[in-house]
Amino acid sequence: MKNIYKQSVLLVALVAILSSIVAPSANAAEKGYRYWGYFQAAPGAKTWTMAMTGPTVPIADGSVEGWAFTFSSDSIPDAATPHLAPNFSRICGLVKTVPAGKKRIGLVVDFGSAFLRPKGEKMPRNFTKCVVVDKNAVGVDVLSQVVKVRTEGSGFICAFSNYPAKECGAEITTPVALIHKK
């Protein structure tokens, strides 16, 4: 009986040791994606809403469109919104009237946190701009008036003004700076 007890204790200890060696921490090698996240704020809204569709849907006059170079993964599903809150009056306050058939849209472009920057690349400065577009314009029309947009064959947005220079929705290891924020 004593032998069986000792064997059981040894077996449990061995399993615990092997588990800690063989099974690394779930976050240690977790992968996710670095990409341009698309956010919207309806007229009068003060917070961002992640767009559930691409930038090919109509947007109302007085809206703010937001783009952020961001990251998400299985354990970090919520992409970071632009650091600047949507504020149409601050962005478009100086553009009081527009010609018939046009609309004003606030645009916020956030090039992300330094820890997301692809190696060897220089991050452009974040910016806001009031964009006057045709009344039927969609999000990509607003964006294309301000920055050079590079897309993948499927239409997935890869880069603004050549940032990032080569990648498109790259799979990367979860940045250490994000692991502690969960």
Segment roles from a protein language model:
Residues 2-11:
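Bacterial N-terminal signal peptides that target proteins for export
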Residues 10-18:
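Hydrophobic helical h-region of N-terminal Sec-dependent signal peptides
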Residues 2, 18-182:
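Ubiquitin-like/PB1-type beta-grasp interaction modules and other compact soluble beta-rich domains
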